[in-house]
Regions:
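Acidic (Asp/Glu)-rich catalytic clusters
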Residues: 19-26, 46-68, 95-103, 134-140, ...
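Conserved, mostly hydrophobic/aromatic
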Residues: 22, 70, 88, 99, ...
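Conserved active-site loop/cleft motifs that coordinate metal ions or position small ligands
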Residues: 31, 212-215, 254-261
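Short, electropositive alpha-helical surface patch
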Residues: 81-94, 119-132, 159-169, 195-200, ...
Length: 293
């Protein structure tokens, strides 16, 4: 079973700090950003400290392919403005090139919002963007990993059929999927009352063979709300029992599962949530314990 969280790139330590932070939580996989997730600034490759990070991973028996990278949140590959979309394509191309140099494989990406241009038009632009990015990085084995979205605003890819359309149209084994439990629940997939049918539907439409990463988050909102507000593990409307099914589902044991749950009084909850997950027992006092740290 692979469980971890997103971590910071920790100032001057960069990826060294990311790895050490993940290990302090008891993680055996984790997700990083190559720069601040809210902007496009990136430090020179030499300052990422990737070689030392790889030593830390090797000593901890963590496969580098279980270190996931998340693209900047502001990227929009469905952007109808040509120049803005070109900027996004160039940025993701560079992100993949840096990942290839380090040995990272999976780049999780919010595919984009159609900006009132319509879902079909948005998906067509995402497809075109993916094709350009993959052509720009054709020597690499990196994978563009489409995150399932909640359907907030004009987001694309809140339905499995949207993702199927992209995968089929791009036609490359370098396209995969990141399933976010909060997002699919908020999008209207009732994993609480219909877990097996939702997973079977995903398999029928997208294919479990395309599932590369799982974001394991609870939701502050009800099913179908299209809100995208994460809650701590077991403390939202999805609940502990359903989320623990995802973590220990035999079909998903080899897939990295990443917590993106909110801080509790400015304290990261991941060490405590991971311990609770490993114990398979819900602790209703967990948030109180974290807040007292």
């Amino acid at each position: 079973m692979k469980i971890g969280s997103h971590v910071s790139n920790n100032g001057n330590l960069m990826l060294i700090g990311s790895a050490l932070e993940a290990l302090s939580y008891g993680s055996n996989c984790f997700m990083v950003y190559l720069g601040a997730p809210q902007n496009t600034y990136r430090k020179p490759f030499e300052q990422l400290n990737s070689l030392k990070m790889k030593e830390i991973l090797q000593n901890a028996n963590i496969n580098i392919e279980d270190v996931i990278v998340h693209a900047p949140y502001i990227v929009n590959l469905a952007q109808p403005d040509f120049e803005k979309r070109k900027f996004a394509i160039d940025l993701i191309t560079k992100e993949l090139q840096v990942m290839a140099k380090i040995g990272f494989k999976y780049l999780v990406i919010h595919p984009g919002a159609h900006m009132k241009n319509g879902i079909d038009a948005g998906l067509d632009l995402i497809i075109d963007s993916f094709k350009q990015i993959l052509a720009n990085t054709k020597e690499d084995n990196t994978v563009l990993t489409i995150e399932t979205m909640a359907g907030k605003g004009s987001e694309c890819c809140f339905e499995f059929s949207h993702i199927k359309k992209i995968i089929n149209a791009v036609g490359s084994n370098r396209v995969g999927v990141c399933l976010d439990t909060c997002h699919i629940f908020d999008a209207g997939y009732d994993i609480v009352n219909d877990y097996d049918n939702v997973i079977n539907n995903f398999n029928d439409v997208v294919g479990l063979n395309n599932l590369k990463v799982i974001h394991i988050n609870d939701s502050k909102n009800v099913c179908g709300s299209h809100k995208d507000r994460h809650a701590n593990f077991g403390f939202g409307n999805i609940g502990f029992d359903t989320l623990i099914k995802f973590v220990y589902d035999e079909r998903f044991l080899s897939i990295p599962k990443i917590l993106e749950t909110p801080y509790v009084n400015d304290c990261p909850p991941y060490k405590y949530e991971i311990e609770m997950i490993k114990n398979k027992l819900f602790d209703k006092y967990l948030l109180d314990k974290i807040s007292k740290e």
